[in-house]
């Protein structure tokens, strides 16, 4: 469960290392984001000499959460960290690589480019 003020690791090579969620996109009173939800975030930590700079406002999609994701078959999927991939306005990732596993539910939510770049889909 990601809410405003939550810190996220960045799971791509866009240049950001840490993001802080400032808004969960969806309805006006939405409190939490789960895997596959879009958030607006601010870049808190960056890699030197990359296009994304500190304090830049970006859109991101959540790809991993520590809170369990319950599937229809009863399996609960939990990850070790909260992570997101920085995306542009069209929903395509701004980086060219995705690090770490991502959930299969992203494919159903039309984030196929992120799923194809990921090394492991759970």
UniProtKB/Swiss-Prot annotation:
Record-level GO cellular component terms: chloroplast; cytosolic large ribosomal subunit
Q: List the disulfide bonds.
A: none
Q: One Pfam match, by short name? A: Ribosomal_L14
GO biological process terms held by the UniProt record: translation
Q: Where does the record place it? A: Plastid, Chloroplast
Per the record, the major location class is plastid
The GO molecular function terms of this record are:
large ribosomal subunit rRNA binding; structural constituent of ribosome
Q: Write out the entry's keywords from A to Z.
A: Chloroplast, Plastid, Ribonucleoprotein, Ribosomal protein, RNA-binding, rRNA-binding
Gene3D superfamilies according to UniProt: Ribosomal protein L14
Q: Which NCBIfam families match?
A: rplN_bact (TIGR01067)
Family of this protein: Belongs to the universal ribosomal protein uL14 family.
Query: What's its job?
Result: Binds to 23S rRNA.
> Subunit details for this protein?
Part of the 50S ribosomal subunit.
Give the matching PANTHER family. 50S/60S RIBOSOMAL PROTEIN L14/L23, LARGE RIBOSOMAL SUBUNIT PROTEIN UL14M
Q: What is this protein called?
A: Large ribosomal subunit protein uL14c
Q: Which organism is it from?
A: Zygnema circumcarinatum
The gene name on file is rpl14
């Amino acid at each position: 469960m990601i809410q405003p003020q939550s810190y996220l690791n960045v799971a791509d090579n866009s240049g950001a290392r840490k993001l802080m969620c400032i808004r969960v996109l969806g309805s006006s009173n939405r409190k939490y984001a789960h895997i596959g939800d879009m958030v607006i975030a601010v870049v808190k930590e960056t890699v030197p000499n990359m296009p994304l700079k500190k304090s830049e406002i970006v859109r991101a999609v959540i790809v991993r959460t520590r809170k369990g994701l319950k599937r229809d078959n009863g399996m609960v999927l939990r990850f070790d960290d909260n992570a997101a991939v920085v995306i542009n306005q069209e929903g395509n990732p701004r980086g060219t690589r995705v690090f770490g596993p991502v959930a299969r539910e992203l494919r159903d939510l039309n984030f196929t480019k992120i799923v194809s770049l990921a090394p492991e889909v759970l």
